[in-house]
Amino acid sequence: MKIMVAMSGGVDSTMTAKILKEAGHEIEGCYMKLHQKPGYHEENIRKVKKVGEYLGIKVHILDLQDKFNEFVYDPFVRLYKEGKTPNPCALCNRFIKLGALLNFAKQNGCEKLATGHYVQIIDGFVTMAKDPSKDQSYFLAQVPKEVLKDVIFPLGDKFKADIKELAREVPVLNEFATQPESSEICFVEDTYIEILNKHYNTNLPGNVVDKNGNVIGRHQGYMHYTIGKRRGFEVFGAHEPHFVLKINADKNEIVVGSKDDLAQKIVELENVNLFIDEDEFECETKIRYRSPKLEASVKIDKQNKTAVVALSQNALGVAQGQLCVMYDGERVIASGFIK
């Protein structure tokens, strides 16, 4: 089978290509230029080309910067401006990696696209990886169901520690295998504020108010805060911690309260992506990547692609713009963005 492999020059994508080639498939690699971080692509392309030579495969360089800006970067900046907390990786997987790159793979005669994600496809469902510490099912929950037949994830049934061990036997990787584990958002060097500062003045001091709208303190600019944050603002004469409950971007104002005030049982979603036919069901949900699963009852409005999630217990720090993912056991059955 002819398979296109998304390649970054890192351990996971290299081992993905190696595993598939050793299984007898015809492999081509593709490196995606997604953003304009200085020096980032030159080093990665050098690595990818070395890996390509080692494996004896053709490597494509695909410039997707315009598409990445449209579907990932610009919404990231816009949502923070609106006082929300975006999830760029979920959008990138949907529109770029398993969108634009998949189209490129098909145009080049490939039957499948493979990536180094730690996730499985079982019975047509995105399913949690065998290695729970590396599971990326959450970030693939917005990928359309019809795409899943065209993608494979060879690392989904493997443990990261085993992949690292196998990688030690690959001489080309040993030259640059000391690179840190890639995590967080690829185009953010240190903090998201650095990105926003390129577009806006984020240092706009404003009022901190309580739930009733009374001014009780000052903050350094609303874009510095996300729901649940408890530092970086002043509450006059406060002796107990205060948490950000809401961000009123239009007023440059943050609403704060106690930890109990953060608690929420009803979560409304938009841009819902469904993997099942039912519009009412019981499930477990994650309101952000690292949060524990909570039992919930869900009602979907298919026409408007919205949902109401009733949690069985209070969740803290439910943030607009974050992805809520619904699971039946280990399989993803739906997802939507918190509104």
Curated annotation (Swiss-Prot):
Its main location: cytoplasm. Gene3D superfamilies: Adenine nucleotide alpha hydrolases-like domains, HUPs, Translation factors. The active site is at C92, C186. It is found in: Cytoplasm. GO terms for biological process: tRNA wobble position uridine thiolation. Its EC number is 2.8.1.13. The record marks H117, Q322 as: Interaction with tRNA. GO terms for cellular component: cytoplasm. It catalyses: S-sulfanyl-L-cysteinyl-[protein] + uridine(34) in tRNA + AH2 + ATP = 2-thiouridine(34) in tRNA + L-cysteinyl-[protein] + A + AMP + diphosphate + H(+). Residues 134-136, 288-289 are annotated as: Interaction with tRNA. ATP binds at A6, M7, S8, G9, G10, V11, D12, S13, M32, G116. Coiled coil: none annotated. InterPro entries: MnmA-like (IPR004506), MnmA-like_C (IPR046885), MnmA-like_central (IPR046884), MnmA-like_central_sf (IPR023382), Rossmann-like_a/b/a_fold (IPR014729). Catalyzes the 2-thiolation of uridine at the wobble position (U34) of tRNA, leading to the formation of s(2)U34. This is tRNA-specific 2-thiouridylase MnmA. It comes from Campylobacter curvus (strain 525.92). The gene is mnmA.
